[in-house]
Swiss-Prot record:
Family: Belongs to the UPF0246 family.
Signal peptide: none
GO biological process: response to hydroperoxide
UniProt-recorded name of the protein: UPF0246 protein SEQ_2141
Cross-referenced InterPro entries: YaaA
Source taxonomy: Bacteria, Bacillati, Bacillota, Bacilli, Lactobacillales
GO cellular component: cytosol
PANTHER family: PEROXIDE STRESS RESISTANCE PROTEIN YAAA, PEROXIDE STRESS RESPONSE PROTEIN YAAA
Superkingdom: Bacteria
Length: 243
């Protein structure tokens, strides 16, 4: 069975219904460390303005007091990749695929199923906070590595920020899809292309119930097709040809 890893997104959009929120035990030290920061320190930790930090402080306080609403993570996150992922009108098989084979890597919650109920928050691995003297990456690494050890065939749709939390010995075993567009005879890639394509790729996987590496190579989605010539054992290239 294939296991897919995807990143979180800064942009969030709550979609009813909401649920009671319960913070995982491993996330509590992070919440406590963030709660100790002054508003100015919080702004520096997030690299945001004081006004935005004030909003985040209220969110953190609500989480700490058990007053936050929670939403399925794949519905709450609303970045470019998530907007290009099929999230509504899923068949039971597609919903099962999304909830049992796709996991979200979070700097606040750890590695969670896509349907895990989470609260609105702002957090990534660039957040400047230490937990018992450790960076966020080092704090989560043992748990991330254990996940990689327990899941033998990982398909990584992670950016460097999230991938680097894992030890390199696990990273080198993954398959990492790469997405490029042909423009004026040249192959181009940038974050917008990659984010949109990740969502379309994952949609194709759940719609086709992809379970093998060979099936990944047969996928066609949003104009992208697998390119045998560029691909390696661990990097699968998908190219969108000029029309």
């Amino acid at each position: 069975m294939l296991t897919f890893l995807i990143p979180t997104a800064k942009e969030m959009k709550p979609v009813p219904p909401c649920y009671p929120h319960q913070l995982p035990q491993k996330s509590l030290p992070i919440l406590e460390a963030m709660a100790e920061l002054s508003l100015e320190e919080l702004a520096r930790a997030y690299s945001i303005r004081i006004e935005a930090a004030s909003k985040e402080a209220k969110r953190l306080k609500a989480i700490a007091q058990g007053q936050s609403s929670a939403y399925p993570a794949y519905q709450l996150f609303n970045g470019l990749m998530y907007r290009h992922l099929k999230r509504d009108n899923l068949s039971k098989d597609q919903q099962d695929y999304l909830s049992k084979q796709v996991y979200i890597t979070s700097s606040f919650y750890g590695i969670i199923p896509t349907d895990e109920k989470i609260a609105e928050h702002r957090h990534d691995f660039h957040t400047k906070v230490t937990i018992n003297g450790q960076s966020l990456k080092h704090y989560w690494r043992p748990i991330y590595d254990q996940f990689a050890k327990d899941h033998k065939q990982i398909i990584s749709l992670l950016s460097n920020e999230f991938r680097d939390v894992f030890s390199k010995e696990y990273q080198k075993l993954w398959i990492s899809p790469k997405f490029m567009e042909e423009r004026s005879g040249q192959l181009k890639t940038h974050s917008t292309i990659s984010k949109k394509a990740r969502g379309a790729f994952l949609t194709a996987c759940l719609e086709n119930n992809v379970q093998t590496k060979e099936a990944l190579k047969q996928l066609s989605f949003a104009g992208f097709c697998y390119n045998e010539e560029l691909s390696t054992e661990t990097n699968y290239y998908y190219i969108k040809k000029e029309s």
